[in-house]
Amino acid sequence: NTVSSLNGGTAPDFILFQEIDTSSDRSWHVNQVSEAESRFGSYASYFAQNFHTAFLAYPLTEFHGTSNSGILTLSNVLASSATRRTYPIDESFPTKFFDLDRCFMITRYPTSDGHELVLINSHMSAYDKGGTSRAQQLALLTKIMSEERAKGNYVIAGGDWNHAILGSLTLYPSVQQVPDWVAELK
């Protein structure tokens, strides 16, 4: 209900969701993808699974339990294609078992000038001490965006960056401590 009321009566061309559940304990097994699709019924829908586990015993004080989630792109026009791409992640034990299988989705829309609008819905790693995986993920995304621009395509990337972007850490006064896993993009 909250998400569908956020548009304030406007009709956005694109809506990008991350951490949207299909059947997870954290959302009481409500299929949030189906809910979003029904609330934005005239929109085309593209879903990519990001995380699936029968039971995640983390954090130890309050288990995540069953998790089935992903990213969802809704658009008011049909895409010519939608492709899930995997980000590089930390494969070490136990990180591999507690971090999401990070991904991004590329949807392509033809334009009147013969090029494409390339829309990227991204969900990057968060808990990456030292920022190694996030640096690799950002490099991959930058490469793909640059390649698309070189073809003359228009590129929009949005999503959950799990980064502090260009001075945003000090943009709004706060007494909150910045966790050590936060990486600042410059």
Residue ranges and their predicted role:
Residues 22-25, 53-55, 92, 126-129, ...:
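Active-site environment of divalent metal-dependent phosphoester hydrolases
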Residues 14, 117, 154-156:
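Short, Asp-centered acidic motifs that coordinate Mg2+ and/or phosphate
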Residues 1-3, 59-62, 91-99, 125-133:
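Acidic/histidine-rich helix-loop elements
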Residues 1-68:
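N-terminal, active-site-proximal structural segment of metallo-dependent hydrolase catalytic domains
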Residues 67-81, 98-123:
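Beta-strand-turn-beta hairpins that frame and shape the catalytic cleft
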Residues 129, 133-186:
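Metal-dependent phosphoesterases centered on the DNase I-like endonuclease/exonuclease/phosphatase
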Residues 18, 122, 158-160:
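Active-site flanking residues adjacent to catalytic metal/cofactor-binding acidic residues
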